[in-house]
Amino acid sequence: GHKHHIYHWLTPEGDKILEGKSGFLNPKFYCIWTVLTIGLWILLGKKMRSISAEIDNKPLNVEEGKKYVYKTTVWASLFIVWFALTVASTTPWLWLMSIDAHWYSTMYSWYTFASTFVAGIALITLFVIYLKNKGYLELVNQEHIHDLGKFMFAFSIFWTYLWFSQFMLIWYSNQPEETIYFKPRTEGAFTTLFWTQ
């Protein structure tokens, strides 16, 4: 079929770079790692949701409450570690960076992690403002919303720093194997979109 139009590494024959990356970039590893990653995200998310539902459905005394706090902390910690490991390393490499498999960047996974984090904080902030305006979240005040804004601003700066650092290093080195990523984005049909990101 035409699978190789997205992932050129599916047909690495005759390409020494793609053949060298075939231990990581191959259909079997891609499928297993994708199923494992998403599967664990779902399982850990369902477990945390079920614990939360248990807490909501019955009154607790102090000792039971402490047990649930510990339980939720353990499961949330496991999820955060798994999510960070996958979103800050393997997932961006495998799903996104491998679209252009000749190009690589050690900063790319951190860049995608920071952009995911900024998007998450922005979405949380919008939900908090919406729910606050609807009369929910009575304990949330302007300081909380301001803190969310500061947090979002800080990670936006971090995201921008990573993007600029990656772009500047690739631009300055002017190596063909590195500029291959930016050339079609800065000179092609996506120029405006690229510079407004």
Where in this protein do the model-derived segments appear?
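Transmembrane alpha-helix boundary signature
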Residues: 1-10, 47
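Extracytosolic (periplasmic/ER-lumenal) interhelical loops and adjacent juxtamembrane/interface segments
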Residues: 7-24
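Long, contiguous internal "core" modules enriched in hydrophobic/ aromatic residues
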Residues: 27-197
